[in-house]
């Protein structure tokens, strides 16, 4: 009971009892003990009774024993006494050193760094709960990691801080002087008058005003990104900087007029901050000090620098980038001296010591932030154009005997054997040439090596047989958009499992052998890059050509056996379309293949035999003997009008394709080839070193007496309704 009574007695102290105990009624005692003044203005600390419950507070006698006149304030005690940040005069929270509180410095620094790139800064509202919690933490003096907080939240809390300053930042006592200086007509006179009024502000107010106006100036210069120019900023933050003492008693119209005047004043201060406050802007001590906001100097700046998504759009960065710093953490030594001057002396001394404005320092910081270091954020990837140039450089198309691409030493083709050196996305379709079929892979060869002709023919034949077993569709190489290689190479055909394959009808075995050099090919009939390549070589020379007959990649070889034939023809027979090839074959009976005797006795065969003086017919044994002989040179090209004519026809006439009718039985039994002038190259399938039985038909075309040729074709005669599918080819 006694304990309860004593406890109640201590809780029933009122203001009069406390005044008698501490004996501090005079105004001088209040100045000597700032805690009492802070308690008078801060009701949340001084109240003894809460609405719902009572809070235990320190008794005033205990406080007075600690705050005796004989004892001085220590650093830690002063920090505890000045824990309250809001609703305090700047002269109290700044202290005798005239330095801004640490949280305010940190907030200004973050706003200076992130504000120009944040849309709606100072305009957008923040979460109310987060705002209250942050204010409580700052008021209590707890260490708060401001870097992790949203920029809009910091801007809202900073506006609350300005609103809570007694008599406002621009001082309500100087309201009439501010308005009088603003009403001057001449801009120079207006600036001088505003300078004089600014000098009348208390030193802490002037220090905070300079920092704030410079930050707002930086934000307004980047208004195309943050949508906040000087006018918008003045509307949002102006009423928190200057008001009248009795503004709440004003009418709505008077309040509106007052806000317009304050908005005009703040906007003019933002636009003319250098003319009014000078270019030597004192640097934030938080930027240069080692113990203030180190995360902004190192971790925050380095995170923004390494983040490839961060991009500063401040136009001031480009103008100030010439004096940029090497890294954001290495600051110049002169601003550090400036910060020391701020900590030890007043703003006048700081203006004399600081040789560099804060705008340049911040701009240099942002300039370094605008250059992301991709070593940390993402790998360095060359663009598609760079890949194209590098791969084209590594890929060498030689003019040697085999016409094989020889990769350079150390090139990417040697190390990436399993990788397709010509991906689809690297070679876009340009000027009639598109991507190479995805099934084709280039075999890597040693530099300077040339495969023998027999091995090359075997490789081509093997790839044809493999492709026949896989039955995977491939794009037509005769299309103007499907000729990528101007020179012929060795390919290994592979089937992609992810792509649907189309089953084609079984054709004769003549698909797998190396045909006559004058066999109809899509490259020549379409007038593609192959015929353009030969127009440069008027001198006959041995060459391997890539001929795709019904999708099979085969090797064509010339032969020097019948030089009389080459001399007999004054012009090289140009590439013919499908109609020209089968016109002679269907001369008398369209749609029905001629027999061997009829083809031998046809007018085209007799004409060729009479003019070229070649062998009319050859047996399989004679062809097998002739194909082992030396290869012949190609005859000269036909005139330009023949090439253009065939190209025109080739673009319109379809070639043999997918929809093929079954072969007639008598075609399957035919094993004789009608050859004119040249013999066939040696081919062999996989596991078949010998020549396969040839099943073909002899056909002749009569164009004129100078331009006629008996062509051997591996396809059966098409029906009339099958020519519409003739331009497609499949493997």
UniProtKB/Swiss-Prot annotation:
Residues 494-503, 641-652 have a biased composition (Basic and acidic residues). Residues 319-329, 464-480 have a biased composition (Low complexity). CDD domains: RhoGAP_ARHGAP20 (cd04402). GO terms for cellular component: cytosol. Residues 299-311, 380-399 have a biased composition (Polar residues). Pfam families: RhoGAP. Keywords: GTPase activation, Guanine-nucleotide releasing factor, Phosphoprotein. InterPro entries: ARHGAP20-like_RhoGAP, Rho_GTPase_activation_prot, RhoGAP_dom. Residues 88-277 form the Rho-GAP domain. The keyword Phosphoprotein applies. The modification Phosphoserine is found at residue 400. This is T-cell activation Rho GTPase-activating protein. It comes from Homo sapiens (Human). The gene is TAGAP.
